[in-house]
Amino acid sequence: MATFMTEDFLLKNDIARTLYHKYAAPMPIYDFHCHLSPQEIADDRRFDNLGQIWLEGDHYKWRALRSAGVDESLITGKETSDYEKYMAWANTVPKTLGNPLYHWTHLELRRPFGITGTLFGPDTAESIWTQCNEKLATPAFSARGIMQQMNVRMVGTTDDPIDSLEYHHQIAADDSIDIEVAPSWRPDKVFKIELDGFVDYLGKLEAAADVSITRFDDLRQALTRRLDHFAACGCRASDHGIETLRFAPVPDDAQLDAILGKRLAGETLSELEIAQFTTAVLVWLGRQYAARGWVMQLHIGAIRNNNTRMFRLLGPDTGFDSIGDNNISWALSRLLDSMDVTNELPKTILYCLNPRDNEVLATMIGNFQGPGIAGKVQFGSGWWFNDQKDGMLRQLEQLSQMGLLSQFVGMLTDSRSFLSYTRHEYFRRILCNLLGQWAQDGEIPDDEAMLSRMVQDICFNNAQRYFTIK
């Protein structure tokens, strides 16, 4: 019987173990998409205790706590202490067997805290609380200290076009920070004209760009100014959360002006008008990314804020989102082609939340590759609910079957937690075990030089190359 979470966790044969320990584990982390707070990096935040760093803002854990019947006051309540929330989590973790949270929890205790051979639960919670809090009180366990311990080379934060990026400026000016922290452009509130807050947001964009927006070309001018601002801060990637993937042929500016005017006047838009405006903004933005050498990321298929009562109580991003089932292939094909037809499709990473769409994306990327850029269009790593062993394996296998796994840009945390870098370790172990199994079965050569190069490329080198602006 195998022992739980040894040094060879998830590594089933000698080839896999060699690939992981000798080649994957030492590689730096290039975390090109996350939701870390740039302010916490700039200020080098020191965390008061394990409950704070572990549970604050982590909606993966919040969902598990709710599923275990824990009262909301012990999850997000301001009236309860970090310790009380921590103990609620300690009582919940033994109930998460089979959920990736059980693995992640013990990996996070192992690295960076060095706690091994101890199962986390109510019986061990007090001892672990004390050990971890002692370490969190030291400089090595500040926000930046943890990033350095985890060998992080680069992080891409997620930032709104109206953001001042003041903390990115602060980080860039601080010579003591040897980790690159780049903003990523997230313009969801610009192209989602159907949202209730669209008009209010446009007012904020006007103020940030110093451009009055009454026509579509005004919007282009405002966005161009903000794109320039992001570029000056080292931005090299955009990200778009797309719940419903729409497409319509882009109309002329007169029609776009009319659509924008109707929305500003508070009139209801038709579904066609919404699709026309959304497509026009996305295609125009995509062409700007291509001209700047940026990467365009499309995260497709979430249903957000399903629970109205809890949304009113807690707001968005609190653990009430799930997988959508809208069809995406036709609209995605037309959207990408609208940029590619003028040779203005940027480097692009496609992510789907519904795993039934894996093959859609794995085959779609082959339609729009380009010379001079290996893996120009990527099928991104298993996202969100697919960010677990089975989901990662499905994505790796389907990409390898329908594309080139060797050109894959690899893993990202997509997380708000400084302890989530162990997800890169989790991914690397799964990757090495997959390659090791193929080699052991004679499906690929047992060639250490060939396989090690592929592992190192997927773990770090491909992403570093891909996100470099030439």
Swiss-Prot record:
<keyword id="KW-0413">Isomerase</keyword>
<dbReference type="GO" id="GO:0042840">
    <property type="term" value="P:D-glucuronate catabolic process"/>
</dbReference>
<dbReference type="GO" id="GO:0019698">
    <property type="term" value="P:D-galacturonate catabolic process"/>
</dbReference>
<comment type="pathway">
    <text>Carbohydrate metabolism; pentose and glucuronate interconversion.</text>
</comment>
<comment type="similarity">
    <text>Belongs to the metallo-dependent hydrolases superfamily. Uronate isomerase family.</text>
</comment>
<dbReference type="Pfam" id="PF02614">
    <property type="entry name" value="UxaC"/>
</dbReference>
<dbReference type="InterPro" id="IPR032466">
    <property type="entry name" value="Metal_Hydrolase"/>
</dbReference>
<protein>
    <recommendedName>
        <fullName>Uronate isomerase</fullName>
        <ecNumber>5.3.1.12</ecNumber>
    </recommendedName>
</protein>
<dbReference type="GO" id="GO:0008880">
    <property type="term" value="F:glucuronate isomerase activity"/>
</dbReference>
<dbReference type="InterPro" id="IPR003766">
    <property type="entry name" value="Uronate_isomerase"/>
</dbReference>
